[in-house]
Amino acid sequence: MREKGRESLYQDYLEIIGLFRSYLKRKIKTEKNQGYQKQGINRGEKNSQVLLGNLYHSIENCQKCSLYKLRNNLVFGAGNPDAELMLIGEAPGREEDLQGKPFVGAAGRLLTEALGRVGLSRADVYIANILKCRPPGNRNPQPEEIKVCFPYLERQIEIIKPKLICTMGNFASQLLLKTSQGITRIRGKIQWYKENTSVIPIFHPAACIYKPGWERDFLEDLKMVRDELKKRNNSKNNLVV
């Protein structure tokens, strides 16, 4: 009888432990979902900052083209991971390669100043390039380099889901818009990339350094970018009942 009593108590003990474990699992799951809701993250989904981090770690040691042999740092992108406006250039320069951040050289300083002059801030946008590694001598990107690197940029766009993309210069504009027309012909014209994302091509800020006469057009195009973004936001607000 004693053995049976002990066995019965042991079975009761195991049942209690099992129930307690089930309770803990439910509690942890509930608290995790509540945490997601507080952060504005849908259940079962990861936020854009986490997804961008995952993408960075998946490509930080990329060796798909020869540029990796010359780089000091991979220049992934920087800015607000939930930005409504995304700026895209062509490739990192010397300062970008040294610091691992996009648009931190002379062209970057001009861009930051110009954004401020039209009421925009770098803190609110996301900036990336077609290439993540610096081409030697700041030469133009080669077709094979663009081919292997462009999917990374596409994934960044997919994660960030910007309302508006501003392509800076020939390479970014021609690539995203699938056109052979030069930037002087297509700049300042609203076009479409995918779904609800519009694109406005503008001069690359580096071009304005070498051709100061273009800076006025550069600023006017950024004003257009600002106004289009406001228009998109106002349109969305008017749909809310």
Language-model features: locations:
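Non-catalytic accessory regions outside enzyme or core folds
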Residues: 1-29
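A polyanion-binding, active-site-adjacent surface
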Residues: 18-28, 33-241
